[in-house]
């Protein structure tokens, strides 16, 4: 016979007071600070030689204990159907290098379950990035919800594990990893479709690409030169007839050659100066 009951959300299963208590646990100033300092949520984590292996839980220990206690108290009195689960739809990591491309080294990044002593990658979701591949975006999708329990002396939850390999001679920071995720907590759990870990290589940012127009410094110099010329040649009750000079002549910068047949080859169009280091 098919199930005829109704599925209730966490808010419906618990009273308004307990729901507010859960909100305070998750979004209190202390909890937000712990998420930043202990989990590096949205912060840049530096991979150094003295920190070759980094294990960052997705929930701080204090917050984990309070959430587990909240669900357990509701479960013990029959208000909740379980002792609570942690759900993370996706973990996204932005990885950038902080050394030159010829440095020989790599990073191994994966999602693990702290309930596993071996800290093995969940469902084989693991990504290796060589130094010359960076920058890159990496994503992980757990296939199950993690019970809010304690295993031995470990608070069980998902964790991002980063391993640094190689980089001989580089003792400082060789890569920066910024991880983002959104943890959810519920009294019900589920299993999810297995999706391989995602790895997207990103083109390095070309910061000179947008420098196609004169900078503020160039415009200021041009305006100052024009003001000086005007004060020297201004005659009372006389018509001003000055030969306008192009910006490239005033700044003594050669203009790039115009493409043959393009509109920029027209004599009536003003020359555009080359941009060098922001000028």
From Swiss-Prot:
Main location: host cell
Function (record text): Transports viral genome to neighboring plant cells directly through plasmosdesmata, without any budding. The movement protein allows efficient cell to cell propagation, by bypassing the host cell wall barrier. Acts by forming a tubular structure at the host plasmodesmata, enlarging it enough to allow free passage of virion capsids.
Record's protein name: Movement protein
Organism field: Cucumber mosaic virus (strain CS) (CMV)
Location of the region described as Disordered in the Swiss-Prot/TrEMBL record: 246-279
UniProt-annotated location(s): Host cell junction, Host plasmodesma
Record flagged with keyword Transmembrane: no
Record GO biological process: transport of virus in host, cell to cell
Taxonomic classification: Viruses, Riboviria, Orthornavirae, Kitrinoviricota, Alsuviricetes
Pfam families, per database record: 3A
Hydrolase keyword on record: no
InterPro entries reported for this sequence: MPV
UniProt KW keywords: Host cell junction, Transport, Viral movement protein
Biased composition (Low complexity): 254-268
Family (UniProt): Belongs to the cucumovirus movement protein family.
Gene Ontology terms: cellular component: host cell plasmodesma
């Amino acid at each position: 016979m098919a199930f005829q009951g109704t599925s209730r959300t966490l808010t419906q299963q618990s009273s308004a007071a307990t729901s507010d208590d859960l909100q305070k646990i998750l979004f209190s100033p202390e909890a937000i600070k712990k998420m930043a300092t202990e989990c590096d949520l949205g912060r840049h984590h530096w991979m150094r030689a003295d920190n070759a292996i980094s294990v960052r839980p997705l929930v701080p220990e204090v917050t984990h204990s309070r959430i587990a206690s909240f669900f357990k108290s509701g479960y013990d009195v029959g208000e909740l159907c379980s002792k609570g689960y942690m759900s993370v739809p996706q973990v996204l990591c932005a990885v950038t290098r902080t050394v030159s491309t010829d440095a020989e080294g790599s990073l191994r990044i994966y999602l693990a379950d702290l309930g596993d002593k071996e800290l093995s990658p969940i469902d084989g979701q693991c990504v290796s990035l060589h130094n010359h591949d960076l920058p890159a975006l990496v994503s992980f999708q757990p296939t199950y919800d993690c019970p809010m329990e304690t295993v031995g002396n470990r608070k069980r939850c998902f964790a991002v594990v980063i391993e640094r390999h190689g980089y001989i001679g580089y003792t400082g920071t060789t890569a920066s990893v910024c991880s983002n995720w959104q943890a959810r907590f519920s009294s019900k759990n589920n299993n999810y479709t297995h999706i391989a870990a995602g790895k997207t290589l990103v083109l390095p940012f070309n910061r000179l690409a947008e420098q196609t127009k004169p900078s503020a410094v160039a415009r200021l110099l041009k305006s100052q030169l024009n003001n000086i010329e005007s004060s020297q040649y201004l005659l009372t009750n006389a018509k001003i007839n000055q030969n306008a000079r192009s910006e490239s002549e005033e700044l003594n910068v050669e203009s790039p050659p115009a493409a043959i047949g393009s509109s920029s080859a027209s004599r009536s169009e003003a020359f555009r100066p080359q941009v060098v280091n922001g000028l």
